[in-house]
């Protein structure tokens, strides 16, 4: 356990920041899950709408330092390819 005043403060800050980071990461994972479920169901319109929300959540997570920019870009690229494939398959 921390003994110095500064280390006690850092411990408190870590607890708060961990909670915020966990909530943000959970939000991104939930958005990804919703998009994958929409793709799995084959609902093109829902998948396209959910992709917009997911891309936004990924971009926000990059700004907050939750994900690396390349990781978010990779997710968006792969998910967009799946949504486009679903749209062309349905058409």
Swiss-Prot record:
Originating organism: Acidobacterium capsulatum (strain ATCC 51196 / DSM 11244 / BCRC 80197 / JCM 7670 / NBRC 15755 / NCIMB 13165 / 161)
Q: One GO cellular component term, please give it.
A: cytosol
Return the annotated region ranges for Disordered.
Answer: 1-31
Q: Which UniProt keywords apply?
A: Ribonucleoprotein, Ribosomal protein, RNA-binding, rRNA-binding
InterPro entries, alphabetized: Ribosomal_bS20, Ribosomal_bS20_sf
Q: Give the family this protein belongs to, as stated in its UniProt record.
A: Belongs to the bacterial ribosomal protein bS20 family.
Q: What name has this protein been given in UniProt?
A: Small ribosomal subunit protein bS20
Q: Which Pfam families match?
A: Ribosomal_S20p
What is the top-level taxon of the source organism? Answer: Bacteria
What Gene Ontology terms describe what this protein does at the molecular function level?
Answer: small ribosomal subunit rRNA binding; structural constituent of ribosome
Please name the GO terms of the biological process aspect recorded for this protein, alphabetically.
translation
Q: What does this protein do?
A: Binds directly to 16S ribosomal RNA.
């Amino acid at each position: 356990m921390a003994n110095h005043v500064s280390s006690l403060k850092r411990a408190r800050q870590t607890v708060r920041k961990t909670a915020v980071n966990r909530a943000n990461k959970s939000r991104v994972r939930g958005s990804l899950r919703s998009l994958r479920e929409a793709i799995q169901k084959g609902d093109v319109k829902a998948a396209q709408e959910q992709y917009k929300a997911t891309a936004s959540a990924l971009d926000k997570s990059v700004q907050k330092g939750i994900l690396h920019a390349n990781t978010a870009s990779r997710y968006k690229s792969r998910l967009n390819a799946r949504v486009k494939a679903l749209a062309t398959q349905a058409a």
